[in-house]
Curated annotation (Swiss-Prot):
TGBp1, TGBp2 and TGBp3 seem to act together for cell-to-cell propagation. TGBp1 is the main movement protein that physically cross the plasmodesma with the viral genome. TGBp2 and TGBp3 would facilitate TGBp1 function. It is found in: Host endoplasmic reticulum membrane. Keywords: Host endoplasmic reticulum, Host membrane, Membrane, Transmembrane, Transmembrane helix, Transport, Viral movement protein. GO terms for cellular component: host cell endoplasmic reticulum membrane; membrane. Residues 22-59 are cytoplasmic. The chain crosses the membrane at residues 4-21. Residues 1-3 are lumenal. Belongs to the Tymovirales TGBp3 protein family. This is Movement protein TGBp3.
Length: 59
């Protein structure tokens, strides 16, 4: 169950990154391990994705 949730979240984040990196304004989100950076303007969609990024433990 946990892997399904992680897989679904990964897919959503990948699609979100592709959506924003293909726009003409070069908005992007870089996700590296447990950190992320974006130059995207604030939006309700961006806030929704960021709210799903929660610290977690692999142990």
């Amino acid at each position: 169950m946990h892997l399904a949730i992680v897989g679904a979240l990964t897919l959503v984040l990948t699609l979100f990154v592709l959506h924003y990196t293909t726009k003409d304004d070069r908005c992007y989100i870089l996700i590296n391990g447990h950190s992320a950076f974006t130059n995207c303007p604030a939006s309700p969609d961006l806030a929704k994705v960021i709210s799903q990024l929660k610290p977690h433990n692999h142990g």
